[in-house]
Regions:
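Gly/Ser-rich oxyanion-binding loop with an adjacent helix/lid
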Residues: 77-149
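ATP-binding N-lobe of GHMP and related small-molecule kinases
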Residues: 1-95, 113, 119
Length: 149
């Protein structure tokens, strides 16, 4: 069983003129996020970079909440396992660059890595799960595929 996973997810923009809210693009600005399963309950969160002073350090952290949801949806045997999350955020928060979309995609991709070790990430399945959480596929699709039309 895999006990740690790392992912790298890009910033995005879905505010593209006449394509506003119907197409999006990935940008060369990245959040790097990792998770390690712990032998004890709880969550430990270490964040550096953008938002390091403002993001929650508990289960309400968007990556952790999404990761937990993904673990349940993907049938991970211990969805309530203790977690150590590390994040190096380069995507500014609340600036229209998709930091929430990146957090959601990060959480789900981490869940995939833990729940389905050795199985190639199904990007279409990831999009379905991420869009259900985010509510706007134009925000999460480019974080998964690079460009979404």
């Amino acid at each position: 069983m895999v006990d740690s996973v790392r992912v790298r997810v890009p910033a995005t923009s879905a505010n593209l003129g006449s394509g506003y809210d119907c197409m999006g693009v990935a940008l060369d600005l990245w959040d790097e996020v990792g998770v390690e399963v712990l032998d004890h309950p709880g969550v430990v969160i270490d964040v550096s970079g953008e938002g390091a002073d403002t993001v929650p350090r508990d289960e309400s952290h968007l990556v952790v909440a999404t990761l937990r949801q993904g673990l349940v949806e993907l049938g991970y045997p211990r969805p309530d396992a203790g977690l150590h999350l590390t994040a190096n955020n380069s995507i500014p928060q609340s600036r229209g660059l998709g930091s929430s979309a990146a957090a959601i995609v990060s959480g789900l991709a981490l869940a995939w890595g833990l729940a389905r070790p050795g199985v190639v990430l199904d990007r279409s399945a990831l999009l379905t799960m991420a869009a259900a959480i985010e509510g706007h596929p134009d925000n999460v699709a480019p974080a998964i595929f690079g460009l979404s039309l």
